[in-house]
Amino acid sequence: MKSNFSKFKDFIKYKKVAVVGIGVSNRPLIKFLVKLGAKVTAFDKKHREKLGSISLELEEIGVDLVLGENYLDKLDGYDVIFKTPSMRIDRPEFVKAKESGAYITSEMEEFIKYCPAKVFGITGSDGKTTTTTLVYEMLKKEGYRTWVGGNIGTPLFANIEEMKEDHMVVLELSSFQLMTMDVSPEISLITNLSPNHLDVHKDFEEYVWAKKNIFKYQSSNNLLVLNKDDDLTNGMENEALGDVLKFSLVEKVYNGAYLSNNKLTMQGKEVCDSKDIKLKGRHNIANLLAAFCMVNKYVSIDSMKYVATNFSGVEHRCEFIREVNGVKYYNDSIASSPSRTLAGLNSFERPVILIAGGYDKKIPFKPLAEGGYDKIKILILMGDTKNKIKSAFEKVISHKKCEIEIVIVNSMEEAVKVADNMAEKGDIITLSPACASFDMYPNFEIRGNEFKNIVNSL
């Protein structure tokens, strides 16, 4: 049972509230808490000069600022602390604050707890953003007032009073956001699971445990959607508290969605033919099947079909940029894990020139090398992980007695220049890093946009 938002308003009024992080996503939260009558202090590692005009803007509405290297040392004495998702709750500063009586939470936890609309939550290692967008588009096509947020879209908590019971909310949720959750969306999906974010999580087991929070607190009338082709997610059916639907690319699933004879089918009803889908790759067929399961109770087959046959993809996901001298360029900057890069490679019909490498999330690259060696013509590596990826491929090349030319570069501009010089007519060049961007870029969007700008200047 959802809690009425008036309870939160009564609870937060006059409270001393700390918000950790003054990034773009937290700014609406800070302003909203001030509007609700809280006494807000915002914390950030950046100094005033780096934050720019937002520091003055927040101070003008009565927000106190704690900035600089040791900013978390001053978390004592607060009633409520909103932490940024990527910060572990077992940090000493949070542990100490909790022992002193602070209620530690996050924007997403409070949003799901109080949101009056029906909430669809999507998580997994790969396919989250595309599937979230597909679910959003299908609900919108059916005529629902639909909101999208979480890891994509805009922060939604500040808009919660505009939402009604007959609205729909679609959330992309990361393991960071889920790690401290004690509330679950009514309709939840885990797309697939493979090692990821092991720079933050203690191990893969903790990562999986965090993902499970998306359904751990559901009720008997809620829905969990699982990938039947993924052993880990398929096995979670026994832990479900409500109904379960599954999707599969390899076998018929009568209580769910499946691909058979190139037809995408939902509970025995044909939705569309795979040849009519604009999205590239089998992984995107899986994303569509997952979306069908999520919206099945709320959306007609016609709306599913319309989106499946008209939606051409999300920016930075196997996005075609242009063709230059017979060479096609694709931007797959969202591919921040080996499994996502493998899915991208599998969507092409010939070996490609791959640009990869980036921030080290402490995950293995052996699966990428073993699964992708025959799909790569030339491998161009950059970033913190370049030598780690090179080593993984060299072992597979030696074992398989195959040939892949590997080139190490120091910048995106150099990577594109090398790829352009080495490419022949008919080749495909794709940026699909298999890593996060944080060693060189603030996020994958900026990385992808730089790649596109360089390609468009050729």
Swiss-Prot record:
InterPro entries, per database record: Mur-like_cat_sf (IPR036565), Mur_ligase_C (IPR004101), Mur_ligase_C_dom_sf (IPR036615), Mur_ligase_cen (IPR013221), MurD (IPR005762)
Q: Which reaction does it catalyse?
A: UDP-N-acetyl-alpha-D-muramoyl-L-alanine + D-glutamate + ATP = UDP-N-acetyl-alpha-D-muramoyl-L-alanyl-D-glutamate + ADP + phosphate + H(+)
Instruction: Report the GO molecular function annotations.
Output: ATP binding; UDP-N-acetylmuramoylalanine-D-glutamate ligase activity
Cellular component (GO) terms are: cytoplasm
Highest taxon listed in the record's lineage: Bacteria
Q: Where in the cell is it found?
A: Cytoplasm
Which amino acids does the record list as binding ATP?
G124, S125, D126, G127, K128, T129, T130
Pfam families, alphabetically? Mur_ligase_C, Mur_ligase_M, MurD-like_N
Predominant place of localization: cytoplasm
Q: Which UniProt keywords apply?
A: ATP-binding, Cell cycle, Cell division, Cell shape, Cell wall biogenesis/degradation, Cytoplasm, Ligase, Nucleotide-binding, Peptidoglycan synthesis
Q: Pathway it acts in?
A: Cell wall biogenesis; peptidoglycan biosynthesis
Gene Ontology biological process? cell division; cell wall organization; peptidoglycan biosynthetic process; regulation of cell shape
Function of the protein: Cell wall formation. Catalyzes the addition of glutamate to the nucleotide precursor UDP-N-acetylmuramoyl-L-alanine (UMA).
What family is this protein classified in?
Answer: Belongs to the MurCDEF family.
The name on file for this protein is: UDP-N-acetylmuramoylalanine--D-glutamate ligase
Question: What organism is listed for this UniProt entry?
Answer: Clostridium botulinum (strain 657 / Type Ba4)
The gene behind this protein is murD
